Amino acid sequence: MKIILSRFVLGTALSIAPFASTQAQCVADLNLNAMVDYDDLLILLANYGQSCETEIWHDPIISEIHYNPSTQQGADTEYEFVELMNPFPFDIHVGGWQLADGIACVFPENTWIEAEGFLLTANDTAVLAPLLPEFVPLLPWTLSSGLHNSGESLRLVRPNGTEADHVIYSDAGTWPQDADGAGGSLEWKGSGYDNSFSTSWAGSNALGGSPGTPNSTWTD
C-alpha cells in the first residue's frame, strides 16, 4: 500500500506540475521569462534608486499672449504679457514652475492659481498691476526677457524639468493678425482647443486683451 500510495502521490504531483508552474508568479522575474535570471538583476541595477511614487501634476494652460501691443496702447516693453489659466475647479500650486524659451520667469514657492483663475507674467509688472483683478498673481520676467513680434517659443516647465505646455506662436500663416500690433492680444479659444495649433487662437476683442480675466473670444 505504501508503494502504491507513493506512486499515486508522485504521479499526481507530476501531473499538476506544468499547470502549477504556469500559474506561479515570481516577484523578482522582472523580464517575465518565467525564471529569475541574470537579466532580472541587470534590470534591477539599472533602476536602482528610482522613486516608485507616481507624480500627479495639475497643469495650468498658456491661455493668452500679448506679444505686440499697438502704439495706441503703449510700448511693447510695458504691456507685453503671458497669461496662464487654471482649468481645474480647485486651486493649484505652481511654486517652482517656470516659463522658458522666449521669456524667463521662475515662479516663487507658495505661488497659487485660484480655481479656474489666472496668473500673469510680464516685463513691466508696475504698469499691468492696476489692470488686474484682485488675487491674480503677477510675476516679473527676468534676464531682460521680451516677446518677439515675429514669433516665439513659450514653454511651461514643471519643477522636475518636464514640459507641461508648449506654444510656438507666429505673426504669419494662419495665426490671427489682429494680435500683431492691431491692438488685440492672442487669446486661446478655450477648452476643446489644442493651444499648440494656430486655429485654436484668436485676436482679442478688446484693446490690450483680457489679462487676468476670461478671454473675450472664448467659445464655451
Identify the residue ranges that each predicted region occupies.
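Alpha-helical segments with a strong preference for the paired helices of cellulosomal dockerin domains
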Residues: 30-52
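Boundary at the C-terminal end of the N-terminal hydrophobic targeting segment
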Residues: 22-24
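Disulfide-bonded cysteine-rich modules in secreted/extracellular proteins
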Residues: 26-33, 62, 220
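Bacterial N-terminal signal peptides
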Residues: 7-18
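Positively charged n-region of N-terminal signal peptides that target proteins for export
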Residues: 1-7
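Activation on beta-sandwich/Ig-like modules and their edge loops
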Residues: 53-198, 204-210, 218-220
